[in-house]
Each structure stands twice: as C-alpha cells, then as structure tokens.
Regions:
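Extended beta-strand/beta-hairpin segments
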Residues: 1-74, 86-171
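Alpha-helical metal-binding/catalytic segments enriched in His/Glu/Asp
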Residues: 75-80
C-alpha cells in the first residue's frame, strides 16, 4: 500500500472508532501451540497461519526454528516498525529507511530453574531504530519513535506486564 492509502485507511478506522467507541474492544485471535516433536512447537490461529519454534540443540531441541524468545523480539521489532510506518504515513512523511532491531539480555539459570531469584525471561530489552525520511527533520523522525513507544501494542504488553490468567484442562 502507498503512504496515501495507509493514511486514508488509518483515518477511516480512527473516525469509525471515534464515532463507535463500543466497537473498538475485541477479542484477539488466540494462538494455539502444540508439540510437533521434541521441543519443536507449532502455533496456529483460526486462519490456519502456522509459526514454528524450537530450542537450541544444547538444551535438547532440534534447532529447526527460532526460539520463542527470538519470536518475542521479532514480534516487538515488527510491531514497532509497523507503527512507525503507519504514523509516518498518517503525518505525510515518506520514509526512505526503516529498520528496527530488538535485542535482549537473558540469564539461562532462570529458564532452567537453577536460581529462583533469576527471572526466566529477558532481564532487559534494547530497541535500535534506524530511520530516514524525505524532507523530514531529525526531530520529526525522533517523534515518530517516541510516539511509537507509547502506542506499540507489543511494546505496551511487554513494558506494562499484562496480567496472565492460566487455566488447566486435564484430558
């Protein structure tokens, strides 16, 4: 889609939800994961989209797919890149470069239950955004990133620590 098409689409959705705020709340498509073999998992949704993960060989996996942790970082990088592109189009900024890199630091002792004082997930997350735009000032480009960090759904879920509700169904 062109910037103009994105701009028009976003404007239309914003107008619709402004006029119909009760329609903005929806249940997100669930992801269902099953073990394929060993530690290789297959996640699907109702549209039959498939996503695979696996663990490194050193921990008993087959190393046939990215780890779930990498998929989390990829989700954040993709979400931030999408939000930057949407906001740029909305503001009439044509991006010439956009690259979002997400890294993290983890301590595997948490994952492996070696030390209960160490978190199983990332200890921190770093985001590097490289961007350039036609006739856009450095301040405008920085504002795109600042805005995105306030509105990225994946970034929000990670930084806000969304409550989890776990149910178990024994079959």
């Amino acid at each position: 889609m062109s910037n103009q098409q994105i701009q028009e689409a976003v404007k239309g959705v914003v107008q619709y939800y402004t006029e119909n705020p009760d329609k903005a709340l929806s249940e997100d498509k669930p992801a269902t994961a099953t073990i394929v073999e060993g530690l290789r998992c297959r996640a699907t949704n109702s549209d039959e989209v498939e996503l695979f993960s696996d663990m490194p060989k050193g921990i008993g996996g087959g190393a046939t797919a990215p780890t779930p942790g990498w998929l989390l970082r990829a989700a954040l990088a993709n979400c931030d890149a999408t939000m930057i592109a949407m906001r740029a189009a909305e503001l009439g900024i044509t991006l010439t470069t956009l690259e979002v890199t997400v890294g993290s630091t983890s301590d595997d002792r948490g994952l492996l239950q070696i030390d209960d004082s160490i978190h199983a997930g990332p200890l921190n997350v770093q985001i590097l955004v490289k961007l350039g735009g036609k006739e856009a000032t450095k301040e405008q480009l920085q504002e795109l990133v600042t805005w995105t960090e306030k509105h990225s759904p994946v970034g929000d879920a990670i930084s806000r620590a969304v409550p989890l509700k776990v149910s178990v169904q024994v079959v």
